[in-house]
Amino acid sequence: MLKNTLDMTEYLSFLYFIFFSLFFCCFMLFTSWFLGGRSLSRYKNTPFESGVVSVGNTHLHFSVKFYLIAIFFVIFDVEALYLYAWSVSIVESGWIGFVEATIFILFLLLSLFYLVRIKALNWVTS
């Protein structure tokens, strides 16, 4: 009976946390809406930076290669975090963890070779 009571208190504290987090978020949103200023002038949707009206066209076109490089960076950065976590727990994981990390690194290298092969990392098109 005591074990069930402890389990209920753990769930109850988690539910309190969720409830108060949602309440606090809704309270902050409502407060900002209630206290925030409202501008109904014609300049409301005019873009500006530091109080200065922009000159020229504000729509810039970037090459898709910038986005590809950013996506590749994020992907390989996340894998670096996984490898860091593995290196911290290498003593506890033993040989099985070493083999799994080796397979993971091999998949990373294969994906990098695939990106080089399809020329996804080439900046200049031929």
From Swiss-Prot:
GO cellular component terms listed in the entry, alphabetical order: NADH dehydrogenase complex; plasma membrane
Catalytic activity reported: a quinone + NADH + 5 H(+)(in) = a quinol + NAD(+) + 4 H(+)(out)
GO MF entries: NADH dehydrogenase (ubiquinone) activity; NADH:ubiquinone reductase (non-electrogenic) activity; quinone binding
Membrane topology field: Multi-pass membrane protein
UniProt keyword annotation of tRNA-binding present: no
Enzyme Commission number: 7.1.1.-
UniProt xrefs under Pfam families: Oxidored_q4
Similarity annotation: Belongs to the complex I subunit 3 family.
HAMAP family, alphabetized: NDH1_NuoA
Name the record gives this protein: NADH-quinone oxidoreductase subunit A
Organism: Buchnera aphidicola subsp. Schizaphis graminum (strain Sg)
Lineage of the species this protein comes from: Bacteria, Pseudomonadati, Pseudomonadota, Gammaproteobacteria, Enterobacterales
